[in-house]
Structures are given as C-alpha cells and as structure tokens.
C-alpha cells in the first residue's frame, strides 16, 4: 500500500465519536431502556428516536423480505438471492407497530437520528431502513446510530443497501470485547460504517468484508467479556473527550510513511500492540480494508477514460444515422443496416461491435463487484448507457434479423436480446423519471429501443394473416396480436417518441402500416369497432 498517502480509519473514528450525536444518542438509548418504551425528543434541533432493547429468546434465523403485497422496502435495490432479515427482529418490528407510531410524530422534522442499544439497535436499523427505502423518500434527513447491535440480515440485504446508496446513513458502535454484534451464523452480513472501540480509541471500517474479517480476528484474539455489552456509555463519554487530548505513539519511533503511521495508530486505538501477533492481524485487516475500498474507485476512474476512448464509435453510429435519414432512398438507419452491406455499413458495424464489447465488460465488472456498488447511479453512467442503448440497440436488432435463421432463430425478444440491454433497463428504472412534457418535434432517437423488434413480430403476424390459406380462427388470433401493436405504435407516433426514420416513406414501419390498411380494407375491418387494448401490455418488451 505504498502508493496510499494516508490511513484515516482512526482519525475518522475520533472525529465521529467526538460529536454530540453519539453522546446524545446513548443518553436517549439509556432513557428508552429504563422506561421500556420508545423515546422521541429534540436536542439542539435534532430529533432523536430511541428504541428500547427487548430481551429475546432466539436470534439468528433468517426470513425473506416480502416482495409482493405490503412491501416494507420498495425502494431497496433488488438482488438475487432474496434479501433476508432476522425473523425475530422482523416480527418484533411488526408487533410493536413502530412505523405506524412514527409516521405522524416525525412530520415537519429536519434531521432524525434513529438509535438503539442491543436488540433496540437492530430495531433502530430496521426502522431507519424502512424510512429510507420508501418509494417517496422522507422530507427529513435520517441517520442511524446503534450500540452493540446484533447483525440484521444476509449478504444480499447488505449489497442492496450499498447499491441503493443508503449504507452511509448507518453507524454501528461496537466494543472489541462485546460478543453480541458478532454473529456465529455465517449467513449474516454487516452494512454501513462500523466504529470499533476500546479504552485506547476507535477505528472505522465501512467495507462489509473487512468488518467480517475484523469480527473473526476479535473472536480469536480479543478478551471476551459479557459485561462489555453494557459499557457503551463509558466508551462514548470517554472517547469523546479523548479526541481533545494529544496522542502519543507507544510503538517507538513513528514510521516515516504517513500511511504506515496511520495504520500503526489505528492498531493501537483498538488496544493492540503493533509488534504482537494480534496486532499484525489487525494491521493486515485495516490494510486490506483500504485496498478493497480503493480498488473499485480506481477501476471506475480508469473506466471513465475507457468510455472516452469508445466515444468515436458512438459518434460513428450517430453520423451513420444522420446520413441515412438524409438519403434519397427515404430509409432510416435501421432499414439501411438490415438490407444492405455497403462499405460504410462495415465501418459502422465495427463500431457497433466495439461498443458492445465495452458495455459487456462494464456489466460483467458490476456483477463481479469490481466497481462501486452505486456505480450505475452515477449521472455519467446513467446518461452514457442510455445514449448507447438508444442509438445502438436498433442496429443490434437489425443485425439479428439480417442474419437470423427463420426456422430455428425465433425472435429478438424471445430470449435473444443481449443481457447488457436488460441490465441497462434495470438501471434506468432506478432513476427518477422527470415530469413528462409534450414534445413539439420527433425525438432524435426512438425512445423504445425495442420498437423495431416488436415491429418485426407484427410484420410476421400480418404476413400470415394476409395469406389466402389462413383460416378464420387463426386470422382472428393474429388480429388480437396485431391490434395492440398498432395501438402502441400509434401512441408513440402521436407523442412524437419516435425518430423521423420511423416515419420515413419507405421505412419498414411505413410499409407495414400501408399493408395493414390494405388488409383492413380487404377484410372489411375498417369500420368495425376494434377491441379495447391494454396499452401497457402492448408495450411490454
């Protein structure tokens, strides 16, 4: 880690614990525990909600969160496998009707700190997560501080919280001698920032894997004391004053390297010596945490440079589209690319392939956690992926139908759509949609990137229905498919959510529209009342 200039885990812990948030939170927890009821009060403009600890017989059994019906966390990023939480904590949260009691109490507040000790901490984390993950976020800021809280859920829950950009709202204070926060069940995973404390100071870790590693080290090296679970008041008030005092390094001379000096101070803050075996293990854990946290950030920065390097490929496709739109043949770039094999088509095809490889690599890196959990929520990548998909997917559809084996190939939307587009669709669904405005001109690119694939299916339905050999029953079934697409396409055109190439005189859509009109006239459908169509069903990809 020589390329790292500073190690800040010990400094971060010192700064955090010195703020009134932690002393006031613990005082609130203590009052709630004594009264055995939820305490809500204001201190210096901050509303504290302290949830009391509840003696429980059994913790450690996981249960899946409901994904249908009354969903507790609708705004939480969904992952596979299913996010799970401790069954006893979930049951207690529902029994105590915490969410019903808070909805009115917190109206008009600006900053709310949800806090709790032991099982009260787990309930506090659950409550804060419920507030933060609603479809409509609360009007106030939410922060959660727990003391000696048991772990709440599985790895999928931890990952979902991180990807939803909610992890920074949680801070868990844990004594290195307290057994309660360290679950023996390997299925449980931490989330948020962990502030490990001892009489010597504290260290902050915010990577789930590093927190688990620290738990394992403490299980084998730290002195285990059942009374430690009740000593958080001592730690909070002692450490908050310790920050104001000067620190002296106990391990001889301070290392010249500022990063190594920071690591050494962090090891001592947890009460370990830099020279003994336990201290070496803690040092390795802190260094690993730094490396794990930095690696995705650095890779994301490198990827931004790689994105810039493929920009010419995207511009090549844009220029190709513009040239096709202006051509005398009155065909859009979809039809040009599908029908012809000109020299300029070869060049744009190479750009299409280059972009596909780049985005396939990005998707793979996201899935293997090589990038930050919230990578896909960054504005740069939201816009870049959207622009890429709007411009390139029609060419991928054209290429598919250009080379398709009609007998065995099926359709593009029948399991042949590249995974990258399905993932980008999920990314876009997680973005707040701006209020819809009426377009005064046609879009620069068709807003439904699967429009041409749906048209190809509708073309086959119409071709089959037009055949003389088509029996009335089969023709009726085909009409039930054609009419929804017609309604959907008309809606897109009316709202001007298609590009001009869709309405070009000789485009596939214009030809299909003319053939449909002729077929209706021939069959006497023109004056019939068409069936009512669910437009949303028609527009499903």
From Swiss-Prot:
Gene disruption phenotype: Impaired camalexin accumulation, reduced synthesis of salicylic acid (SA) and ethylene (ET), and altered expression of pathogenesis-related genes (e.g. PR1, ALD1, BGL2 and PR5) upon some pathogenic infections (e.g. P.syringae) and microbe-associated molecular patterns (MAMPs) recognition. Loss of the systemic acquired resistance response. Reduced fitness characterized by lower seed yield and survival rate. Increased sensitivity to P.syringae, H.arabidopsidis, turnip crinkle virus (TCV) and E.orontii. These phenotypes are reversed by SA treatment.
GO biological process: aerenchyma formation; cellular response to trehalose stimulus; defense response to bacterium; defense response to Gram-negative bacterium; defense response to insect; ethylene-activated signaling pathway; leaf abscission; leaf senescence
Organism: Arabidopsis thaliana (Mouse-ear cress)
Active site (record annotation): 118, 178, 229
Enzyme class: transferase
Alphabetized PANTHER family for the sequence: LIPASE-LIKE PAD4
One GO cellular component term: cytoplasm
Mutagenesis or variant effect for residue 118 to A: Loss of antibiosis and deterrence against green peach aphid (GPA, M.persicae) feeding, but normal leaf senescence and plant defense against pathogens
A Pfam family it matches: Lipase_3
Role: Probable lipase required downstream of MPK4 for accumulation of the plant defense-potentiating molecule, salicylic acid, thus contributing to the plant innate immunity against invasive biotrophic pathogens and to defense mechanisms upon recognition of microbe-associated molecular patterns (MAMPs). Participates in the regulation of various molecular and physiological processes that influence fitness. Together with SG101, required for programmed cell death (PCD) triggered by NBS-LRR resistance proteins (e.g.
Main localization category: nucleus
Keywords for the protein's UniProt record, in alphabetical order: Cytoplasm, Ethylene signaling pathway, Hydrolase, Hypersensitive response, Jasmonic acid signaling pathway, Lipid degradation, Lipid metabolism, Nucleus, Plant defense, Transferase
Full protein name: Lipase-like PAD4
Taxonomic lineage of the native organism: Eukaryota, Viridiplantae, Streptophyta, Embryophyta, Tracheophyta
Induction statement: By benzothiadiazole (BTH), at site of green peach aphid feeding (GPA, M.persicae) via TPS11-dependent trehalose accumulation, and H.arabidopsidis. Induced by P.syringae in a NPR1-independent manner, and by salicylic acid (SA) in a NPR1-dependent manner.
Record localization: Nucleus; Cytoplasm
Family statement: Belongs to the AB hydrolase superfamily. Lipase family.
EC number: 2.3.1.-
């Amino acid at each position: 880690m020589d390329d790292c200039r500073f190690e800040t885990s010990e400094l971060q812990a010192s700064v955090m614990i010195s703020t009134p948030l932690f002393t006031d939170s613990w005082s609130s927890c203590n009052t709630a525990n004594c009264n055995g009821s939820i305490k809500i009060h204001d201190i210096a403009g901050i509303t504290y909600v302290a949830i009391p600890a509840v003696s429980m017989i059994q913790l450690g059994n996981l249960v899946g969160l409901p994904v249908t019906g009354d969903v507790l966390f609708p705004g939480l990023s969904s992952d596979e496998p299913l996010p799970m939480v401790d069954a006893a904590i979930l049951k207690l949260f529902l029994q105590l009707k915490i969410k019903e009691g808070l909805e009115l109490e917190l109206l008009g507040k600006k900053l709310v700190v949800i806090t709790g000790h032991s099982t009260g901490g787990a309930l506090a984390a659950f409550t804060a997560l419920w507030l933060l993950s609603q479809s409509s976020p609360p009007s106030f800021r939410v922060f959660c501080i727990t003391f000696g809280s048991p772990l709440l859920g599985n790895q999928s829950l931890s990952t979902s919280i991180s990807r939803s950009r909610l992890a920074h709202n949680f801070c868990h204070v844990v004594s290195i001698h307290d057994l309660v926060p360290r679950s023996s069940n390997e299925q449980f995973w931490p989330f948020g920032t962990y502030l490990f404390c001892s009489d010597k100071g504290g260290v902050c870790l915010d990577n789930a894997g590093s927190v688990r590693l620290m738990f394992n080290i403490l299980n084998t090296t730290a002195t285990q004391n059942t009374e430690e679970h009740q000593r958080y008041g001592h730690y909070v008030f002692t450490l908050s004053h310790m920050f104001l005092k000067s620190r002296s390094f106990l391990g001889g001379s301070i290392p010249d390297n500022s990063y190594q000096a920071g690591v050494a101070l962090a090891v001592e803050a947890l009460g370990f010596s830099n020279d003994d075996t336990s201290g070496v293990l803690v040092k390795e854990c802190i260094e690993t945490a730094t490396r794990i946290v930095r690696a995705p950030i650095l890779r994301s920065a490198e990827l931004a440079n790689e994105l810039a390097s493929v920009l010419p490929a995207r511009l090549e496709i844009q220029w190709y589209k513009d040239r096709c739109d202006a051509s005398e043949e009155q065909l859009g770039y979809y039809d040009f690319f599908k029908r012809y094999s000109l020299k300029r088509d070869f060049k744009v095809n190479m750009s299409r392939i280059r972009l596909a490889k780049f985005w396939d690599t990005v998707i793979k890196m996201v899935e293997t956690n090589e990038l930050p959990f919230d990578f896909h929520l960054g504005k740069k990548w939201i816009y870049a992926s959207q622009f890429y998909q709007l411009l390139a997917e029609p060419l991928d559809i054209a290429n598919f139908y250009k080379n398709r084996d009609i007998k065995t190939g099926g359709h593009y939307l029948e399991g042949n759509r590249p995974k990258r587009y399905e993932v980008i669709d999920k990314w876009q669904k997680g973005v707040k949609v701006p209020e819809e405005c009426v377009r005064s001109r046609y879009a620069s690119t068709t807003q439904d990137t699967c429009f041409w694939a749906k048209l190809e299916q509708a073309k086959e339905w119409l071709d089959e229905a037009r055949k003389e050999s088509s029996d009335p029953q089969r023709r009726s079934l085909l009409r039930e498919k054609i009419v929804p697409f017609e309604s959907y396409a008309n809606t897109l055109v009316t709202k001007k959510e298609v590009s001009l190439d869709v309405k070009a005189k000789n485009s596939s859509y214009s030809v299909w529209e003319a053939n449909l009109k002729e077929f209706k006239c021939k069959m006497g459908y023109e004056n019939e009342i068409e069936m009512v169509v669910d437009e949303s069903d028609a527009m499903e990809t």
